[in-house]
C-alpha cells in the first residue's frame, strides 16, 4: 500500500521528488497548451509565424546580443526603411519566416522535453520491486518521442546560426529537405498514437503516482523568459506531434512564396513540400481526438472525416446544407437562425448510417426531381452585380471619406448576391440512397467535388460497419457537437475573405496537357480541366480520348479564361461506351474517374513569361502538364500581321477586297463546317480546341492552302470552332471597331427600350460594310446554334459570353486606363460586352439592306 498524506493523497515518493526538483527554466504556456506572450505584439501581424495552434502566435524570445544560441530579433527590430528594394523586401520576408520557424521549433522542442522528462525516472523504477509502470507500458506511451525530439533538435541547432547570419546568399533548403525526408518517424508515432493514449489512460486509472505525473508536466519557455513553467497534461503533449506534422507544409508554402525561383533553395523547398504533402496524404485518416464526437456502437470514437456546404434538392427547391461525414454515418444539417450574440447551432435534417448508404448506378437511379433551371443570363447578371459591388467597395476603401458603415452595407449586399449564386449555380447531380428506400439529391458545381464525397464515403464503407439507430438524445448530442467539430466554417464566397487575401488571377491560362503514367490496364483515357470562379469550380477544357493505352500522350494545349481564379484541377477519366450506363438526367454516358488532383495557381510562378512544367499525382497516376499565364492587358493587345497576304491579323476590309467577297472565306468555311457536323456538339465554342490543331488550321488559311477543305473535314470540330474564335481575336481591331466601343457601352446601358433600339441599330449602321456583313453572318449562325440548346447546351447567353469580349473590346489607349483600375471594373466591362452581343442575338432578324435603308428618328453623330 502506498503511503498516504494527512490530506488523504499518496505521499511523494523519490520519483516525485526527482521530478519536482528538476530545473525547468521559465516560460509562458497555459493549461490548454496555448503559448501566450506578455511582450509587445508590435509587428506580429506582419510576420508569417508558423503557429502551434489556431489561437497562438509565438514570438521570439529576447536574447542578449552575446548569446551564442540566440535567435534573430523580433520583426520590429529588423524592419527595413521605407525605400527598400524588392530584393530587400524578399530577403526580409524570408528571414521573418525563418525566425518564426525557430520560435515555433523552440516551443515544440520544449514540449517534447517536458514529455520525455519523466521517462528516465519511470524506466529506473521499472526494474525495482515497486515499479510505477512496466518497461512495455513505458515504451508504448513514449514510442518514437525520442526520435522526433532528436530530429527537431538537430534541425533547430543547424538552422539557428544560419538565420543569425542571414543574407541573400544563405541557403536553408537542404535542412528542410532533410527534415521532410525524416517524416517517416511520424508515421510510426501516428500509428501508435491511439494505443499510447489508451495505455496512458489505463495506467493513470491504476496508478495514482502516474496520474499525478501525467496531469502536471511542466513546459519551460524560451531562454531568458521571466515567466514560470506552465502545467500541461500528458495527453495534451502527446497530441503535439500530431498537430505539428499536419501543419508541416505551411512553412514551406510561406518560404516558397518569398524565395525567388532562381534561388538555390527553391528546388529543394519544392522537393520538401512534395515529400511533406505525400506524407500527409498517407496519414490524413488517422485519429484526431479534437474531432471526436461520441462513440460508435462498437465503442470506438466517432470522428469527423469530412464536411462542407452542399446544395440539396428538397421539396422541389434548393436548400443550402452543411453535410458532415463521420466514420459511421452521414449527417445533413442546417444552421439555425439565431439572434446576435447567441451561440449558433445546427439543426439535423436527416442522417444515414454508412452501413445503409448506397450509390445507385446510372441505370438504377431515379430521375432527378423536377426543378426549374436558373437561366444562364440570370447567373451572368448576378456575376456582373457582384463585380460592380466589389469595385464600389474598393473605391470606398481608397476614398478618404469612405465610411466603414457604407463598406459594411456594400459587403452585406455582396454576401446576399454571392449566396444566391452559390445556391443557384450548381448543376451536377449527386445522389445517395438509403437501403430503407429514401433518396437524397444534391447539386454540386464540379465533378471533382462529387468524386471527393463519393470516394470518402466508399473508403469508410470498406471497414466493418454496423447498423445503428441513434436515440433522440444521441442525435442531439451529435448535432450539437457539429458546431465545434466542423472544419469548413464559412460558405466559399469572396465577401468572407480578408481584405489582404489574394483576389486571384484575371486573364488567360495556357495549359498543355502532355501525358500520363501509372494506369494498371489499357483504357480509353481523357482529361478535363476545371478552374474556380466566384467561389465554385467550372469545367473549362477537355482533351481528346486516347484509346487503348496505359500511357496516353495528349500533348494538347488549351487557353482558359480566369476570373479571380486561384486553383486548377485536372480530372482523368476512362471513357465508357456502354450505352446501358446512361445518366437519366441528360442521357449522357457516365465515364469513370481514374484520378484527380489540383494545384494552387501561385501568381509568382504562373505569371512568369516562361512555361512552367508540373506534375499532378492522383491515385498512383502522374499527369504531366505545362502552364503559362497571360494577363488581361496582354490579351487586349492586337498585333497586326506583318504578312498582308494572310488572313490572321489582317484588316477585314483588306481580306474581303482581296477575296472579292462580302464575308471572309475563313469565316464562311468554319461556320459551314460547324453547322454541318458540330451544331449538336455539347459545349461547341465553349470547349477549347487543341491548340496545335488550331495553329495548323491558322497556318493553312494564312497560306491559302489547297488542302484546307480536306483539313477541315478531318479536323476535330472544337479545333475548327477555336480557329474561328482566334480569327476574330487576332483582328487588328475588333469586329465592332475601336471607334464605336464607348458608344456601344453607352447604348446598352440605356433604360428606355425605344432609345436603346434606335441607338443600337444606328451603331450597326455605322460599321464599315465588311464588318457589318460579317457580323450579321455570324449572328445568324449563332442563333442557329442556340436553336439546338437542348442538345448542345449552348444558349444565346452562353454564346454571347464566348464571343462578346472577342467582338467588342476597348482600344489599347482605352485599355491602359482599365489596367489601372480594379480587376472587378474590367470584369464589369466584360459583362457589358456580353450584353451588347446578347441584345443583337435576341433581336428579330436584321437585314443588311433594310438596316441601310432605315434612318434614325434623331440624327446623331457617333
Swiss-Prot record:
<dbReference type="GO" id="GO:0043197">
    <property type="term" value="C:dendritic spine"/>
</dbReference>
<dbReference type="Pfam" id="PF00620">
    <property type="entry name" value="RhoGAP"/>
</dbReference>
<dbReference type="InterPro" id="IPR001331">
    <property type="entry name" value="GDS_CDC24_CS"/>
</dbReference>
<dbReference type="InterPro" id="IPR008936">
    <property type="entry name" value="Rho_GTPase_activation_prot"/>
</dbReference>
<dbReference type="Pfam" id="PF00621">
    <property type="entry name" value="RhoGEF"/>
</dbReference>
<feature type="domain" description="C2">
    <location>
        <begin position="488"/>
        <end position="616"/>
    </location>
</feature>
<feature type="site" description="Arginine finger; crucial for GTP hydrolysis by stabilizing the transition state">
    <location>
        <position position="686"/>
    </location>
</feature>
<feature type="region of interest" description="Disordered">
    <location>
        <begin position="30"/>
        <end position="84"/>
    </location>
</feature>
<dbReference type="InterPro" id="IPR000219">
    <property type="entry name" value="DH_dom"/>
</dbReference>
<dbReference type="Pfam" id="PF19057">
    <property type="entry name" value="PH_19"/>
</dbReference>
<dbReference type="InterPro" id="IPR037865">
    <property type="entry name" value="ABR_PH"/>
</dbReference>
<keyword id="KW-0343">GTPase activation</keyword>
<feature type="compositionally biased region" description="Basic and acidic residues">
    <location>
        <begin position="34"/>
        <end position="44"/>
    </location>
</feature>
<feature type="domain" description="PH">
    <location>
        <begin position="303"/>
        <end position="462"/>
    </location>
</feature>
<dbReference type="Pfam" id="PF00168">
    <property type="entry name" value="C2"/>
</dbReference>
<dbReference type="GO" id="GO:0005085">
    <property type="term" value="F:guanyl-nucleotide exchange factor activity"/>
</dbReference>
<keyword id="KW-0344">Guanine-nucleotide releasing factor</keyword>
<keyword id="KW-0966">Cell projection</keyword>
<keyword id="KW-0770">Synapse</keyword>
<dbReference type="InterPro" id="IPR000198">
    <property type="entry name" value="RhoGAP_dom"/>
</dbReference>
<dbReference type="InterPro" id="IPR037769">
    <property type="entry name" value="Abr/Bcr"/>
</dbReference>
<dbReference type="GO" id="GO:0030424">
    <property type="term" value="C:axon"/>
</dbReference>
<comment type="function">
    <text>Protein with a unique structure having two opposing regulatory activities toward small GTP-binding proteins. The C-terminus is a GTPase-activating protein domain which stimulates GTP hydrolysis by RAC1, RAC2 and CDC42. Accelerates the intrinsic rate of GTP hydrolysis of RAC1 or CDC42, leading to down-regulation of the active GTP-bound form. The central Dbl homology (DH) domain functions as guanine nucleotide exchange factor (GEF) that modulates the GTPases CDC42, RHOA and RAC1. Promotes the conversion of CDC42, RHOA and RAC1 from the GDP-bound to the GTP-bound form.</text>
</comment>
<feature type="compositionally biased region" description="Polar residues">
    <location>
        <begin position="54"/>
        <end position="67"/>
    </location>
</feature>
<dbReference type="InterPro" id="IPR035892">
    <property type="entry name" value="C2_domain_sf"/>
</dbReference>
<protein>
    <recommendedName>
        <fullName>Active breakpoint cluster region-related protein</fullName>
    </recommendedName>
</protein>
<feature type="domain" description="DH">
    <location>
        <begin position="93"/>
        <end position="286"/>
    </location>
</feature>
<feature type="domain" description="Rho-GAP">
    <location>
        <begin position="650"/>
        <end position="848"/>
    </location>
</feature>
<dbReference type="InterPro" id="IPR001849">
    <property type="entry name" value="PH_domain"/>
</dbReference>
<dbReference type="GO" id="GO:0005096">
    <property type="term" value="F:GTPase activator activity"/>
</dbReference>
<dbReference type="InterPro" id="IPR000008">
    <property type="entry name" value="C2_dom"/>
</dbReference>
<dbReference type="GO" id="GO:0035556">
    <property type="term" value="P:intracellular signal transduction"/>
</dbReference>
<dbReference type="InterPro" id="IPR011993">
    <property type="entry name" value="PH-like_dom_sf"/>
</dbReference>
<dbReference type="InterPro" id="IPR035899">
    <property type="entry name" value="DBL_dom_sf"/>
</dbReference>
